[in-house]
Amino acid sequence: ITAIVAEPRLGAYLKPEGEVAEGADMPAYERGDKVVPYRIIDRMKGADLVGIHYDQLMPWVKPTEKLDDYASEQVKAYAAAHPDKVFTGENGKDRFVEMTSAAFVVIPGDYVTTEDGTGIVHTASTFGADDAKVCRDAGVPGLYLVNKQGETRPMVDLLGKYYAIEDLDAHFIDRCVDKAAYGHHAGDYVKNAYDPRFNEGGKWDKEASEKAEDLNIVISLEMKMEGTAYKIEKFTHNYPHCWRTDKPILYYPLDSWFIRDTLDKERMVELNKTINWQPSSTGTGR
């Protein structure tokens, strides 16, 4: 296989004694060998990699954007240049564009370092402000599902499980979903903490859910067997949890309302003074 890694991170994955000189025969590798033979075939700057496309590691769903008043100019331009990728939802009115050829490409990001990992990070525009910004600037589409109401939604629903196929738009399924690959885990909970098996009677059995194998492990092993994961390890790292339930938080791209209250600021301050705050400091200085 051919792999890419930031040079300062090479030693974290491969041992110096495993390097094979140019022109020398590559030794055979057997599962369990302590040393992995490798050869450095080229050295490049990160900027040299920008624009290179790669295969989608989990090709369950093709990247799709909605064509509406909120679509970016880049999405509209892509749709105009690729009319064969545009389709209408089963409701007959909502329009979408499949954008696989604009995705799965190396893009630059100033928040990536060579201090951890490989110096190359996976970027998902629907899960984080940094990711969203660099993807938007580079014209990389999001990875959404389309439900029967014609709405774009993340692959995981608000209950914490992959959307069931029957809840998705039929035209979107035909154009953008590998039903066999996606259906393998459709309906599965991504975190055991949200699985009803560990929440009987409305009470979360934290100990049982943390002991049981969860979907992250299952998918990691599947990728290893398919040859799309080079190495799988367990790492202890910080992860945000809900302060009320102590359950791991799930990230979602959500529809949000933003209220412009500055127009009524003076009236709000005036009304605030009529409230008997206890303690009084609660109603001031904010």
Specify the residue positions occupied by each region the protein language model found:
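Non-cofactor substrate-recognition interfaces
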Residues: 1-286
